[in-house]
Amino acid sequence: MSTKPSLTLKRRFNAPPAKVFSAWTDPEKLKRWMGPGEVKTLIAESDPRSGGRYRIVMRSPDGEDHDISGVYREVIPNEKLVFTWAWKSTPERESLVTISFKSDGAGTLLTLTHEQFFDEAARDRHQQGWNGSLEKLEKFVA
């Protein structure tokens, strides 16, 4: 049995867990930072409860739209989010994202694990995308 590729990213933010968590669950806040580099989030919908759904539509600089959606599997306010992640273009390639938010003095230690990728190329693209998004989140919550 082969294991599907995964990635784990850790980052410290100079903001309390409640502020960082809210940036992930409030649609208006999500629009301000989600997406790497010059990618813009056009649509953000979020119902952050177990069984609730979310949807994000991002537009890349070339004008192409990227539609992602999923279901929240676990929501512990200011501590943990677990949700499925599927691109509209390849819904059969659903993956799973787990984010933990831990208090660190006046800041937050965030650990993002994204697993069950279709292949290593998909993992590598997502790693680049998540790193770019987390850089924007860092500026947003500062």
Model-based region annotation:
Residues 8, 65-70, 92-97:
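Short, surface-exposed coil-to-beta transition loops
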Residues 14, 75-77, 104-106:
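Structural motif
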Residues 134-142:
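Short amphipathic alpha-helical signal-transduction/dimerization elements
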